[in-house]
Amino acid sequence: MKKILFLALLTAMLFSCSDSDNEPVGLKAIEVKAAVDEVNLWGNLVLDISKDSLYKVGYDNGDIVTISGGSLTKPLDMAFTDKMMSVGTWGMCLTYFSNEATLTIGLANASFSDRVGGKEGDILTISLKEKGGFRDVYERMKLWKTANRSDYDSDEMFANFYPVECHGMKSGVVYRSSDPLLESNNPARYEYADRFARNAGINAIISIADTEEDWQSAVEAGSGFGEYCNERYSKGALLFHKFNVDIFVDEQAAKVGRMLRAMIENNPPYLICCSMGRDRTGLISIILQVLAGTTYEEIESGYMRSYYNWHRLQPSSESYNDFLTRILHRTLYIM
């Protein structure tokens, strides 16, 4: 029953670009079968087919597809997009990532398997619902970013390093950034973030993207890790609390609780970081701001600053309100 209610809410609120009662528009692609190879760390469904399998039979980014079969309780309409966040927080999509060979069915910033369904071994059918039906949104939700320091205004901007600030919170207590720990998780920026952690006098570094095993492997290899992070590790002040972005699933919520308790067992200043320092770090920053007694304006300013630091997205940008409503406002509504 909870999943049925969730699907109804998801369709009504989060995916207004598709109406499952309408007749399919502009069908040119053929149906494709795919098996769920695994449910990944994020709770999303990893398929056994590549994006080229769809391109070759008429599908393209910006199409709306229907996924059906397996253990899914009903056919689901969603965008086919290579930019997962273009569907907004808790939006459904058929997507792919540059470092992965096959397609994924997922929820942006949430766990598809927990929220919607699906399991390993499911045989699913992919069919075309509307050719180009998501294209306008897809184009508006594109984000610019590079790995070149020279493309950014400052080292701080490039590292996405800045304080978490609001009413009720002393300045200089909590900072956030992209990953300062490992080159493998933040290739171009980790040394910048590590240097700013040192300059800010950070005592406790809380990573919500790395495991201690990954950290130890890099240290044993002798390269690819933050020097200041290593100093904090030797003092017992480099804390590993990796969790996925759906912090409202019981298992993940428990991990967040353990992270917050570990945080207050150490002295400030604190640095909270995930890979980009944007999504998971943004959620934790909102929680801390709310606990301190923040305002909406402070939440928006702090959360959207990461989008400026990474993507030069600012209030005057044409697509700013799209990201504000589809990402931040949905996140706050869910919280």
Q: What function would you assign to each model-found segment?
A:
Residues M1-I4:
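Positively charged n-region of N-terminal signal peptides that target proteins for export
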Residues F6-L9:
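Sec-dependent N-terminal signal peptides
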Residues M13-S16:
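C-terminal motif of bacterial Sec signal peptides marking the signal peptidase cleavage site
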Residues D19-D21, N109, G117-Y270, L283-M335:
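Cys-dependent protein tyrosine phosphatase-like superfamily
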Residues E23-N109, S113-K129:
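Long, compositionally biased stretches
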Residues I272-C274:
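The Walker A (P-loop) glycine that initiates the GxxxxGKT/S ATP-binding motif of P-loop NTPases
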Residues M276, R280-T281:
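Ser/Thr-glycine-rich phosphate-binding loops at phosphate-binding pockets of nucleotides
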